[in-house]
C-alpha cells in the first residue's frame, strides 16, 4: 500500500540539545516583530555547536558582542576557542562580530575563508562542506541567493538543522514569502530541510521539532 507523509511541528522547549559528538546550544534566540512606528525590530539567532570543535552559527547584530562572549563563557569557551564561524547569509543581523574570530575558518554564504585565503568549495554544485563527522554546511538558497544551513547529526533529538532565515520561525507559513528573493527556490529547500531534520533552529524564533507522520493514502 502506498503511503503519504504528513508533517507537523512542535516547540522543543529548550535552548540546549545534547548530543554525541556535538551538542547544540542556542545562546540567543532570534526574534522579529513590528514596532509601534511601523518599523521592524529583529535580531538573528546565535547557535553554538560544542563537541570536538566549537562552531558558532550566525553572529547576530553588531551590538551582540556581549551576548556572544557571555554565551561562550557559559560553556567555558573564549572566542579563540571557536574553530568555525558559519553565517547562513549576509544580512546584518547574522554577520555582526566576525572580528571576534580572526583565527577561525569563516563561512559566509558560499564563501569559505581562513584569514585572506578563500578556499575552493562549490556549494552551487550541491556539495556539502564537512566541518567534522556529523556536522556539515550545505546550500539552502532562496531567502537570499546563496544561503547555507548547518546539519548536526547524533543529538538526543536526532538530526538538527540550523537553518538561518530559510525558516523565520515555527509558524511562519505565509509570512516568509515577502522576505524571500526567490520564494519558489526557498520553498524547495524548506521541503528538503523538513525531510532531513528532526529539529529546526530558525533565524527568528525558538527551535521546533519536525514530526513526520505516515498514514495510508486513500
Language-model regions, residue ranges each:
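Core dinuclear metal-dependent hydrolase active-site scaffold
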Residues: 26, 47-50, 126-155
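Residues that mark the start of a beta-strand
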Residues: 53-54, 159
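Metallo-beta-lactamase
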Residues: 7-11, 70, 100, 104-144, 146-218, ...
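Active-site HxH/HxHxD metal-binding segment of metal-dependent hydrolases
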Residues: 37, 42-43, 60-130
Amino acid at each position: 500500500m502506498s503511503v503519504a507523509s504528513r508533517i507537523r511541528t512542535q516547540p522543543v522547549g529548550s535552548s540546549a540539545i545534547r548530543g554525541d559528538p556535538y551538542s547544540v546550544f542556542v545562546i540567543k534566540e532570534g526574534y522579529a516583530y513590528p514596532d509601534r512606528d511601523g518599523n521592524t525590530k529583529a535580531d538573528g539567532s546565535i547557535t553554538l555547536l560544542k563537541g570536538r570543535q566549537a562552531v558558532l552559527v550566525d553572529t547576530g547584530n553588531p551590538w551582540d558582542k556581549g551576548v556572544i562572549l557571555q554565551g561562550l563563557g557559559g560553556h567555558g569557551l573564549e572566542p579563540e576557542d571557536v574553530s568555525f564561524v558559519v553565517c547562513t547569509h549576509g544580512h546584518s543581523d547574522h554577520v555582526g562580530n566576525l572580528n571576534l574570530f580572526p583565527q577561525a575558518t569563516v563561512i559566509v554564504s558560499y564563501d569559505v575563508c581562513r584569514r585572506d585565503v578563500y578556499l575552493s568549495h562549490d556549494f552551487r554544485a550541491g556539495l556539502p562542506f564537512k566541518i567534522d563527522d556529523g556536522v556539515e554546511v550545505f546550500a539552502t538558497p532562496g531567502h537570499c541567493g546563496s544561503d547555507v544551513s548547518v546539519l548536526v547529526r547524533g543529538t538526543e533529538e536526532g538530526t538538527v538543522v540550523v537553518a538561518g532565515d530559510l525558516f523565520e520561525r515555527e509558524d511562519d507559513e505565509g509570512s516568509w514569502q515577502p522576505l524571500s528573493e526567490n520564494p519558489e527556490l526557498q520553498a524547495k529547500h524548506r521541503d528538503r530541510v523538513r525531510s532531513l531534520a528532526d529539529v529546526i533552529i530558525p533565524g527568528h524564533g525558538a527551535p521546533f521539532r519536525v514530526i513526520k507522520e505516515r498514514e495510508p493514502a486513500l
